[in-house]
Amino acid sequence: LMGFGTTMNLLDGVDGLAGSLTLLSLFFLGGFLYGIIGHTDVARYLLLPHRPDGARWGILIFVAAGGLGGYVWHNAKPSAVLMGDAGSRFLGLLVGMAVLASGNPFMVLVVSPVVLLNGGTGLVKLLLLRFFGRLGFDVRPPARNIVNAQAHNAATEEEEARQAFFVRFLHRYRFPLHDHCRKKLNWSDPQVLVRFMLVQALLTPLLMGLLVKLR
């Protein structure tokens, strides 16, 4: 729960992004809890364990999604309402609790693939850089990526050229991923929002189908 809350917090850099992706996650989770594992006949047909409290959890999730929809309406760029760190972490907690209620922790990979890809890859990069740093590799970021390079002890172009290729590869990408899309690919905030939502809206049904039918 703490890890997913942190990952969700990393989404809070584009107006409406965290709320919109969470809204998609809640709709799919609510449908799964209420209409699949909360329904005796459907769960039996799909050979899934029936959870008697699944329907109650589904209703709770749909109610939370309705409230979140009102927030997203006012959080569209330019945002009139901000959630801050406390709000984004609460969204992560809400999705995490619903995933645990489903009885399958791996459901988080199904309902929030873009959320995990956006923030999780940044955590992986950080861990890898710390690991390589402990092994003695120069893992300083390149000076071209930092405004005040000396204050951040960044690597010059000559020092960057001497760094290991995997360190240079890691520094080539900015994280969270939405920041890379904005700074490196020159996507606007609305482009990031729509494209991230589209990817999650396409991936989640596909992964859900693999989970319930082809597992």
Model-derived regions: residue spans:
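Alpha-helical transmembrane segments
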Residues: 2-4, 16-215
